């Protein structure tokens, strides 16, 4: 961690003293962190993320990392001259593409994220949702209105899945050994088929199954914004549902807040959508009064 980020030695000491009550509050707790977006592609932010996760472990918190990798998948598909096809804004994942998705997510990206944490002094182990039967998946069901017939029809997205069941035993085995699990969101179906799973959905489901104290969702926006584009610091699940209904929450933020609501309804104490572009975003959220993102409670 670059001490220049925190000013003088006196300022660093003041920051640590201020953080102590929050460290005590979360000691022994499980925190699931969804990592992706711009923070993953920026070298300096990536190093800071690794340091943040290592520090969480050092002060007695049990971090569990779930990562995305959309840009890296896109890059590999281009290199292999595999054309992406989208239906209603969702990528269709055929048999050839799901092999690439698994190779990139469970291989290149997974080991890169684990490496960031290991270089910061902690011990991280990269796995995917297929390992130990962690993420049991089912085919994602989506429908859309046909523009010609105006009839609702099922969309065939190929091997795009969603979590059906989370078996947390492999996570407990790793955390019990003092290791930090780094999880690629690739799941296994009942038929043995590999499924590509949205990282937000995987993180929310894993946090719920673990009964995590916090779910941190790193994004490329400050959090949930109101109609004046100002950050909403805290929302209840009911507030979120009302915000979707009245149009305050729109677009790509809807599935993110829905994952958070689902997680808190499954027992997570709080889910936070925060800006991963902010240096040391995880530490600022966990160890400062009020945090920096939008906290969603049940």
Curated annotation (Swiss-Prot):
Tree of life domain: Bacteria
GO terms for cellular component: cytoplasm
Pathway: Amino-acid biosynthesis; L-arginine biosynthesis; N(2)-acetyl-L-ornithine from L-glutamate: step 2/4
EC number: 2.7.2.8
InterPro entries hit by this protein: AceGlu_kinase-like_sf, AcgluKinase_fam, ArgB, Asp/Glu/Uridylate_kinase, Glu/AcGlu_kinase, NAGK-C
Annotated GO MF terms: acetylglutamate kinase activity; ATP binding
UniProt-listed Pfam families: AA_kinase (PF00696)
Keywords (A to Z) from UniProt: Amino-acid biosynthesis, Arginine biosynthesis, ATP-binding, Cytoplasm, Kinase, Nucleotide-binding, Transferase
Binding of substrate, residues: 69-70, 91, 196
GO biological process, one term: arginine biosynthetic process via ornithine
First-level EC class: transferase
Catalytic reaction list: N-acetyl-L-glutamate + ATP = N-acetyl-L-glutamyl 5-phosphate + ADP
Gene3D superfamilies in the record: Acetylglutamate kinase-like
Residues at the site labelled Transition state stabilizer: 34, 256
SUPFAM superfamilies recorded: Carbamate kinase-like (SSF53633)
Cellular compartments annotated: Cytoplasm
Function: Catalyzes the ATP-dependent phosphorylation of N-acetyl-L-glutamate.
Similarity field: Belongs to the acetylglutamate kinase family. ArgB subfamily.
UniProt protein name: Acetylglutamate kinase
């Amino acid at each position: 961690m670059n001490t220049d980020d925190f000013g003088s030695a006196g300022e660093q000491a003041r920051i640590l003293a201020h953080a102590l009550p929050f460290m005590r509050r979360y000691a022994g707790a499980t925190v699931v962190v969804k990592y992706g977006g711009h923070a993953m592609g920026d070298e300096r932010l990536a190093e800071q993320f690794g340091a943040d996760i290592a520090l969480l472990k050092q002060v007695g918190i049990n971090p569990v990392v779930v990562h995305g990798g959309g840009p890296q998948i896109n890059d590999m598909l281009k290199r292999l001259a595999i054309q992406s096809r989208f239906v209603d804004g969702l990528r269709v994942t055929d048999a050839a593409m799901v092999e690439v998705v698994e190779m990139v997510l469970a291989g290149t990206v997974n080991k890169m994220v684990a490496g960031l944490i290991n270089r910061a002094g902690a011990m991280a182990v990269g796995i995917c949702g297929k390992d130990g039967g962690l993420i049991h998946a089912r085919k994602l069901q989506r429908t859309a209105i046909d523009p010609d017939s105006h009839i609702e029809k099922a969309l065939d997205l190929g091997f795009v899945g969603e979590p059906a069941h989370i078996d947390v035993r492999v996570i407990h085995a790793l955390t019990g050994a003092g290791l930090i699990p780094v999880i690629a969101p690739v799941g296994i179906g009942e038929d043995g088929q590999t499924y590509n799973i949205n990282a937000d959905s995987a993180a929310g489901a894993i946090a719920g199954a673990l009964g995590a104290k916090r779910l941190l969702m790193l994004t490329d926006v400050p959090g949930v914004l109101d109609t004046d584009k100002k950050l909403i610091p805290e929302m209840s699940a009911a507030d979120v549902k009302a915000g979707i209904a009245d149009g305050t929450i729109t677009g790509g933020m809807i599935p993110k807040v829905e994952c958070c609501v689902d997680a808190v309804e499954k027992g997570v104490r709080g889910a936070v959508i925060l800006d991963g572009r902010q240096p040391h975003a995880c530490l600022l959220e966990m160890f400062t009064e009020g945090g920096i993102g939008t906290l969603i409670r049940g």
